[in-house]
Amino acid sequence: MNIIEATVAAPDARVAIAIARFNNFINDSLLEGAIDALKRIGQVKDENITVVWVPGAYELPLAAQALAKTAKYDAVIALGTVIRGGTAHFEYVAGGASNGLAHVAQHSEIPVAFGVLTTESIEQAIERAGTKAGNKGAEAALTALEMINVLKAIQA
């Protein structure tokens, strides 16, 4: 039996982070967590990290697709926050971002990590951006790095 597993260390990885500007008071913490994880745990060099700002979470799939198509990156990390309000807008934005990023991940040759918070409240978002529920930006970064190494192992 063959078992393929991988580590998160990827010192030569080239990683793009697509991040939404909307709700940036939360997304800034996701970005800090992602960059810290890439550098400190993944040992990714600063010059191999590219950050691309987009207006909101709904625009993340298009940015991720464009980044993947350049063939400059080994992975794309999508970061954003969608907080439920009093209208159906949440479902459209959260669903569009989630489905769109899944589509890009399935049709590109590189990992696309999902670091988009979809929460019921601002408090839940803050908890998931670095307080008591960890930092989902850091988790997405580690997922991207592990998947880079998993795909390399599969192709070896």
Curated annotation (Swiss-Prot):
Described function: Catalyzes the formation of 6,7-dimethyl-8-ribityllumazine by condensation of 5-amino-6-(D-ribitylamino)uracil with 3,4-dihydroxy-2-butanone 4-phosphate. This is the penultimate step in the biosynthesis of riboflavin.
Active site per the UniProt annotation: 89 (proton donor)
Family: Belongs to the DMRL synthase family.
Keyword Transferase: yes
Reactions catalysed, as given in the entry: (2S)-2-hydroxy-3-oxobutyl phosphate + 5-amino-6-(D-ribitylamino)uracil = 6,7-dimethyl-8-(1-D-ribityl)lumazine + phosphate + 2 H2O + H(+)
One Pfam assignment: DMRL_synthase
Protein name: 6,7-dimethyl-8-ribityllumazine synthase
Source species of the chain: Cronobacter sakazakii (strain ATCC BAA-894)
